[in-house]
Amino acid sequence: LQGDLVINGGSDPYFVWEEAIALGNAIQKWGINQVRGNLVMVGNFWMNNRYDNVVAGKLLQEGINSATWSRNVRSIYKRMPAGTLMPKVAIAGSVISQKSVSHKIPIIRHKSLPLVHILKTMNVESNNDLAETLAKKLGGAKVVQRKAAWSAGVPEAEIKLVNGSGLGVENKISPRAATAMFVAIQRYLQTSPWVIADLFPVSGYDTGTLTDQSRTIPQGAVVKTGTLND
């Protein structure tokens, strides 16, 4: 490619190494093995919970070029489906961030994973960083607090959030509010193809935090675990 490779980010909350590898392979399908110019980051591009465009861009630069992979990326690649190609798209220039570009030719539109998959992953793994990213996308902890209380039909005083992940003793949710939120989610899903088990861990089927042998949870129960040491 004689010129810059422009990445126009759209605030994908779960763009991780696997996504970078897939994007690298998609770029190579266009016959692009080397970019003579820069990797230009435009918009909100997040990767591995890094929100700075240049920092996230450098991670992407590594992800699309297997010749530069760290041991961590190689281990992640080995868990991907058999036959997944190892992309080799080399960037000759630098990673830079710009508000916009004057002239661009679109070649690829990379879609995020479906939100239902992202939420299931977040809850099964109890991924605090991902929860924080989603809360940020919605407007922050206080916006989430207000929307959750309204949806659950409980006073806002029963839901107190200082961050999006719930990590920290300052976050407080009453038992009634926690139960009401589950009921509200199930009610919301009634007009969709999904059920609440598509969003939360299911005991006996999902791993993540449910693998703790000290938990005595009936098989098939839909739950959300939470542990916090002060």
Language model: regions and residue ranges:
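Short, Gly/Ser/Thr-enriched beta-strand-loop segments that form substrate-interacting elements
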Residues: 101-108, 210-230
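Short, flexible micro-motifs
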Residues: 40, 167-169, 229
